Amino acid sequence: MSLNVVILAAGKGTRMRSDLPKVLHPIAHKSMVQHVIDTANSLGSSAIQLVYGYGADKLQAALGEQALNWVLQAEQLGTGHAVAQANPNINDDDTVLILYGDVPLIQQSTLEALLAVRPTNGLAILTVNLPNPTGYGRIVREQGKVVGIIEQKDANAEQLAINEVNTGIMAVPGKQLKAWLNRLSNNNAQGEYYLTDIIAMANVDGVEITTSQPQSAIEVEGANNRVQLAQLERAYQARAAEKMMLEGANLRDPARIDIRGDVSVGMDVMIDVNVIFQGKVTLGNNVTIGAGAILIDCDIADNAEIKPYTIVEGAKLGQAASAGPFARLRPGAELKEDAHIGNFVEIKKSVLGKGSKAGHLAYLGDAQIGAGVNIGAGTITCNYDGANKFITTIEDGVFVGSDTQLVAPVTIGKNATLGAGSTITKDVAENELVITRVKQRHITGWQRPIKIKK
C-alpha cells in the first residue's frame, strides 16, 4: 500500500493583495507550499500530486525541479473538485493523504499519527477543538461516531454550537475516494463540490471513520491575508527557537531572533537579541553570538565569538576565533583557530591564519594569510585590476603597518615587516623591512592660506 499525497494549491489568494500565488508567500526561508511538500516527502510518500491553477508559471518556476505530478484545476469549483482532478493519478490500493498548500506548519508527527489511526479499509480525518469555531466546518457525531461534516454556511443553530471542526486534512483509501468524488454534488449554499461531503457518504456506506488531533491548533491554520501570514511566521519562529533551546542554546529573548534556515547548535551557545540565521548554519559548543548579527550559510567552531552587528556569509570560524563588532565575512572567508577581525574589517575569499589579527578598518580579499600575522588599520589587499582578480600571500609572522596597500599578485615572506603607509607592488623576502612611503619634509615658516573676503 503506497502513500499518495495530494496538495491543494490552486487558489489565487485575493486577500493577500498580491500577484504572487498565495501558496508561494514565504514563511521563514521558503514558501508555504514548500513547507508542505517537504513534510510530505518526510513521510516517505510514493507520489505527490500538486493541484494548481492561478499563477501556474510562477509556481512551476519556484517548484519545477522537484518530483511532483502537476495537476491542473482550470476552474476553482471547490475542494472536492480540486481533489477529483488528481483521480487519474490515484491507484485503488493507495492511501491518499490530502494536504493544503497554505497550511505550512503541519508537522510530520501529526500526520504520522493520523495515518496510524486510519482503519485498513476506512478513513481518518484530522480535527481540532476551537473555542471560536466560526468559519470552519463542524464535525457532526452521533453517539460519538462521526457521521458527517457540515460547512458553516449550511449549518443550523445546533450544529453551529459544535466546537470540534474539520481541518480538511484526511487520509482516505484510494478506491473509495475516487468513487465518492464521482458522486459529489454542488447543491449547497456555495454551489461548490465539497470534499467534506465524502464523510457522510462513507458513513452511509458503512466505512469506519476515525479522527486524530494535532498537538496544537496553529499546525492546521492557514493564511488568507498578510496578517495571518505574519501570525504563522511568529509561530514558526517560536517553534524553531524552542528547538534551538532544547538543543543547548541560551536565547536572551526567544521572540527576538529570526531563523530562516536550518540551524544546528552545540551546548552552551549564547545568542543575543535580533540575530538572523539564514540557510545552513552550524554553531559549535560555547559559541557566542552578539546582538544584531546576521549568519548565512556558515560554520562556527567551538568557543568562537561573533560580536554585535557582524555579518557572516558563506564563511568559517575556527576554534576560539572572533569577528566584530561591525565586521563582514563574505563567501570563502575563513578565520583559523584564535584568529580575529575587528570593527569595519571586510574579508572575502581569504584565509586568516592561526592567531592572526586584523583589528580594524581593513579589506582582505583573495588573500592567503599565515599564522601570527598582524594586519594594521587601513590595510587593503588590492586584488582587482579592473578585469581580473589576483592573490596576495602573506606568510607566517608578518607585521603589516597601518595604511598599507598590497597590490596583487604579491607575496610577503615570513617575519617580514611592512612600514606604515607603504604601497607594496613587489614580493618581499623573509625577515625584510620594507618602507615605500615618501620621505618626510619639514617646511619652516609655512603660512596657511587666508580666506578671501567677498
Swiss-Prot record:
Chain positions recorded as UDP-N-acetyl-alpha-D-glucosamine binding sites: 8-11, 22, 73, 78-79, 100-102, 137, 151, 166, 224, 330, 348, 363, 374
Biological process per Gene Ontology, one example term: cell wall organization
Top-rank taxon, per record: Bacteria
Subcellular location: Cytoplasm
Cofactor note: Binds 1 Mg(2+) ion per subunit.
UniProt KW keywords: Acyltransferase, Cell shape, Cell wall biogenesis/degradation, Cytoplasm, Magnesium, Metal-binding, Multifunctional enzyme, Nucleotidyltransferase, Peptidoglycan synthesis, Repeat, Transferase
Cofactor entry: Mg(2+)
Binding positions for Mg(2+) per the UniProt entry: 102, 224
GO molecular function: glucosamine-1-phosphate N-acetyltransferase activity; magnesium ion binding; UDP-N-acetylglucosamine diphosphorylase activity
Region (Linker): 227-247
N-acetyltransferase: annotated span: 248-454
Associated pathway: Nucleotide-sugar biosynthesis; UDP-N-acetyl-alpha-D-glucosamine biosynthesis; N-acetyl-alpha-D-glucosamine 1-phosphate from alpha-D-glucosamine 6-phosphate (route II): step 2/2; Nucleotide-sugar biosynthesis; UDP-N-acetyl-alpha-D-glucosamine biosynthesis; UDP-N-acetyl-alpha-D-glucosamine from N-acetyl-alpha-D-glucosamine 1-phosphate: step 1/1; Bacterial outer membrane biogenesis; LPS lipid A biosynthesis
A GO term from the CC aspect: membrane
Record-annotated disulphide pairs: none
Binding site for acetyl-CoA: 377, 383-384, 402, 420, 437
The keyword Zinc belongs to this UniProt entry's keyword annotation: no
Subunit structure: Homotrimer.
HAMAP family in alphabetical order: GlmU
PANTHER family: BIFUNCTIONAL PROTEIN GLMU, NUCLEOTIDYL TRANSFERASE
Protein purpose: Catalyzes the last two sequential reactions in the de novo biosynthetic pathway for UDP-N-acetylglucosamine (UDP-GlcNAc). The C-terminal domain catalyzes the transfer of acetyl group from acetyl coenzyme A to glucosamine-1-phosphate (GlcN-1-P) to produce N-acetylglucosamine-1-phosphate (GlcNAc-1-P), which is converted into UDP-GlcNAc by the transfer of uridine 5-monophosphate (from uridine 5-triphosphate), a reaction catalyzed by the N-terminal domain.
Name of the protein described by the UniProt record: Bifunctional protein GlmU
Protein species of origin: Shewanella frigidimarina (strain NCIMB 400)
